[in-house]
């Protein structure tokens, strides 16, 4: 018998949940009595919209897939839409269920669905605000698929359409980011989850939601900031100039 468990979003662990076992969840909400550790998804959604707008996008589109279980990832949409509404930025949202898009790579029907819905928006068939010129994808994997679909339509990224993903993933062979993205530190999430679990096992109180910092990561699918806006603000990661040390 184990003394504690850390469960990730997709874990099927309901049968192990009881008052005698210390349990910490990553991203998924089970109940207010079970601590949930995650990057700050609400702020991440706002940050994605803000970065697109600051780089010149004037009409935004959110594309995401959601799971049937309650999880913190849903807050990305709330943050994105909240920023747009507060700043009167035209936007539209596309949400696919996990049944519609079980995998953005291996499912031909899912890929076809993403492409057809995206094309309808880019052809102004599903939005009254005109063609979007800034897209926030709920994950980096989804952003890669969207970039490929846009290029098949003859649209350039980022010249015609800017694109921001979420997670901050990098290609294994080059170490370069998939796309411009909202980066969350998975190492910090893991360490914080272990710390929360140890505190629970020692009888200490732990917050029900632990939101960790996130930052914008330039990956080449967004335009540079305007000269008048080249300054560091919360959530903006600027390129490191030659000879500059950020440590």
Regions found by a protein language model. Name each.
Residues 3, 57-60, 133:
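Short acidic/polar active-site loop segments enriched in Thr and Asp
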Residues 1-50, 123, 129-130, 247:
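Alpha-helical recognition/docking segments in bacterial nutrient-uptake
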Residues 111, 115, 119-244:
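Flexible loop/turn connectors
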Residues 14-16, 33, 70-71, 145, ...:
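Glycine/Thr-rich phosphate-binding loops of Rossmann-like dinucleotide-binding domains
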Residues 59, 91-94, 156-163:
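Short acidic capping loops at alpha-helix termini that bridge into adjacent secondary structure
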Residues 37-47, 63-119, 136-144, 166-168, ...:
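Hinge/beta->alpha junction and helix N-cap segments in small-molecule ligand-binding domains
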């Amino acid at each position: 018998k184990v003394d504690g468990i850390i469960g990730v979003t997709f874990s099927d662990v309901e049968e192990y949940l009881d008052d005698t076992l210390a349990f910490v969840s990553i991203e998924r909400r089970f109940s207010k009595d079970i601590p949930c550790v995650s990057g700050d998804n609400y702020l991440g959604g706002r940050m994605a919209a803000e970065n697109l707008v600051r780089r010149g996008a004037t009409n935004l589109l959110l594309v995401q897939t959601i799971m049937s279980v309650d999880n913190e990832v849903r807050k990305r949409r709330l943050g994105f839409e909240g920023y747009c509404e507060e700043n009167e930025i035209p936007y539209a949202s596309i949400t696919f269920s996990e049944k519609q898009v079980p995998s953005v790579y291996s499912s031909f029907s899912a890929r076809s669905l993403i492409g057809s819905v995206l094309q309808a928006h880019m052809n102004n068939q599903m939005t009254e605000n005109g063609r979007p010129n800034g897209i926030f994808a709920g994950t980096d994997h989804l952003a890669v698929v969207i970039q490929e679909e846009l290029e098949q339509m003859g649209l350039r990224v980022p010249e015609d359409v800017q694109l921001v993903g979420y997670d901050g993933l990098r290609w294994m062979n080059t170490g370069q980011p998939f796309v411009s993205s909202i980066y969350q530190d998975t190492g910090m999430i893991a360490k914080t989850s272990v710390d929360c679990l140890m505190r629970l096992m020692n009888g200490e109180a732990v917050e029900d939601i632990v939101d960790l910092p996130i930052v914008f990561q330039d990956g080449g699918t967004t335009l540079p900031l305007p000269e008048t806006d080249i300054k560091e603000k919360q959530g903006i990661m600027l390129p490191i100039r030659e000879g500059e040390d950020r440590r």
